[in-house]
C-alpha cells in the first residue's frame, strides 16, 4: 500500500448529526436476516484483523486487512445487502477511528443487539464522507450510534480478480488432511501443485499428499480420476493417496502449476478462523497473476473468503517429493536418537553385557555373601 492521505474523522451523537440534501446522498443498508448473514461471515475476523480498510464499489463491499500476518480480503456482494446504491468511482475508507471504535464494531457479538447498519454517503470524489449509523434494540427500546469517516484522498490497494484460474473443491476430510500436513512443520513453505501427469498435490519438506481429480469441468486437463492411466501414474509416485474413493472436483484451467505459501502456520491459522462450521472449502489459484494468489472459500453461505499471496519461485513438486522422503527419514532417526525409549536408557549407560557363565558366577558370589 502506498501514499495514503486521509482527512479528519468525526463522531456525532443523534443530536448533532449533520443534515444534507437527501438528493445528494445515497445509502447502503444491512438489516434483518441479511445483517445476520454478514455478521456471521465477519465475526471470526473482526476481533483480530489489523489495519482494516473498507472499499465500496458497484460490486459491493470489500474489507481488506491483515490476519495472522497475512493479507485477507473479505468481499460481500451487493446482492447480500438489504439495500445497495452506489454512485461514482470506488471509495476507500480507513475502518479505524481516533478512539477505540471502528466501522467493524457493529459486526461484533456483544450484549447490545444490532438490528440495522446503514452507510450514508455524501459529497463528490475525492472528498466524499461516510456516515455509519448503527441501530441497537434492547429491552423494548432502541438507540443508535454514529461514526463519520472521510474518504482516503490517495490510496493504492490490491483487489483480486473474481474468478481463479484453477479451483479445487475439497470436502471436510480432504481439507483436514492438508491442514494436518501443514501442522507437521513450523514456518515452512506449503506447496500446492497440479501435475502434468494428473493429480492435485499438497505438501511440505516432511510430507506430500495427493488427490485424484475429477477434471471433467476443466479446460486442457487430459486426465480423469476414473482413467486407469491417471491412477497408475499417481500410484507410481510412491506417495499415499488421500480419500482414494472420492475425487476432488476441479474446474478452470488444467494447465500444470506449482505455487508455495511462505508460512504453514499462517495458512493453518487463517483457514481455522474462517472454516468454522464449513463442510469443506474451495481452493482457488490465481496462477497468471503477479504475484500469484490462493483464494480459500469455505463451503458455508456468506462465509468470508481469504486471499493469500503465493510464490512461484519455489521447489518443484518432484523435488519436494524427493526431499520429503529423505527429510522424513532423517527426522524419524533424530527423534529416536535424542528421545530413546525408557527401556534403552539404562542399557546405553552400561558397558557390554558379560557372558552368561560370568553372570551366574557373580550371582552365586552375591548369594554366598
UniProtKB/Swiss-Prot annotation:
Q: Which gene encodes it?
A: MDV055
**Does DNA-binding count among this protein's keywords?**
yes
Query: Matching SUPFAM superfamilies, A to Z?
Result: DNA clamp
Per its UniProt record, what InterPro entries does this chain match?
Answer: DNA_clamp_sf (IPR046938), Herpes_UL42 (IPR003202)
GO CC annotation, single: host cell nucleus
- State the Pfam families in the record: Herpes_UL42 (PF02282)
Primary location recorded for the protein, binned into one broad class: host cell
Record-given protein name: DNA polymerase processivity factor
* BP-aspect Gene Ontology terms: DNA replication
Keyword list (alphabetical) reads: DNA replication, DNA-binding, Host nucleus
Task: Map out region (Disordered) in residue numbers.
Answer: 345-369
Q: Which organism is it from?
A: Gallid herpesvirus 2 (strain Chicken/Md5/ATCC VR-987)
State the similarity comment. Answer: Belongs to the herpesviridae DNA polymerase processivity factor family.
The record's note on quaternary structure and interaction partners says: Interacts with the DNA polymerase catalytic subunit. Interacts with the origin-binding protein.
Localization recorded for this chain is: Host nucleus
Amino acid at each position: 500500500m502506498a501514499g495514503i492521505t486521509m482527512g479528519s474523522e468525526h463522531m456525532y451523537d443523534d443530536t448533532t448529526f449533520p443534515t444534507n440534501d437527501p438528493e445528494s446522498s445515497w445509502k447502503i443498508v444491512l438489516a434483518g436476516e441479511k445483517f445476520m448473514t454478514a455478521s456471521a461471515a465477519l465475526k471470526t475476523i473482526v476481533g483480530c484483523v489489523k489495519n482494516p480498510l473498507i472499499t465500496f464499489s458497484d460490486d459491493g463491499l470489500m474489507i481488506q486487512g491483515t490476519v495472522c500476518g497475512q493479507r485477507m480480503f473479505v468481499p460481500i456482494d451487493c446482492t447480500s445487502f438489504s439495500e445497495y446504491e452506489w454512485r461514482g468511482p470506488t471509495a476507500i475508507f480507513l475502518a479505524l477511528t481516533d478512539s477505540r471504535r471502528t466501522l467493524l464494531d457493529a459486526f461484533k457479538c456483544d450484549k447490545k443487539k444490532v438490528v440495522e447498519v446503514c452507510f450514508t454517503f455524501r459529497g463528490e470524489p475525492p472528498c466524499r464522507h461516510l456516515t455509519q449509523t448503527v441501530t441497537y434494540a434492547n429491552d423494548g427500546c432502541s438507540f443508535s450510534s454514529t461514526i463519520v469517516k472521510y474518504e482516503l484522498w490517495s490510496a493504492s490497494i490490491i483487489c483480486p480478480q473474481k474468478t481463479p484460474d484453477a479451483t479445487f473443491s475439497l470436502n471436510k476430510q480432504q481439507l483436514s488432511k492438508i491442514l494436518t500436513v501443514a501442522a507437521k512443520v513450523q514456518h515452512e513453505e506449503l506447496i500446492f501443485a497440479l501435475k502434468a501427469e494428473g493429480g492435485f498435490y499438497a505438501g511440505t519438506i516432511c510430507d506430500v499428499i495427493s488427490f485424484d481429480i475429477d477434471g471433467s469441468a476443466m479446460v486442457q486437463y487430459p486426465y480423469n480420476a476414473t482413467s486407469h492411466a491417471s491412477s497408475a501414474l499417481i500410484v507410481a509416485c510412491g506417495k499415499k493417496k488421500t480419500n482414494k474413493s472420492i475425487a476432488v472436483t476441479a474446474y478452470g484451467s488444467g494447465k500444470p502449476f506449482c505455487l508455495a505459501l511462505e508460512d504453514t502456520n499462517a495458512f493453518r491459522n487463517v483457514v481455522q478462523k474462517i472454516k468454522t462450521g464449513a463442510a469443506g472449502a474451495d481452493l482457488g489459484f490465481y496462477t497468471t497473476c503477479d504475484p500469484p494468489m490462493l483464494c480459500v472459500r469455505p463451503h458455508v453461505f456468506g462465509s468470508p473468503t481469504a486471499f493469500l499471496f503465493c510464490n512461484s519461485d519455489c521447489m518443484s513438486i518432484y523435488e519436494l517429493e524427493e526431499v520429503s522422503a529423505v527429510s522424513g527419514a532423517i527426522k524419524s532417526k533424530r527423534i529416536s536418537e535424542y528421545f530413546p525409549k525408557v527401556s534403552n536408557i539404562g542399557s546405553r549407560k552400561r558397558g557390554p553385557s558379560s557372558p552368561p557363565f560370568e553372570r551366574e558366577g557373580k550371582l552365586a558370589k552375591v548369594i554366598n555373601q
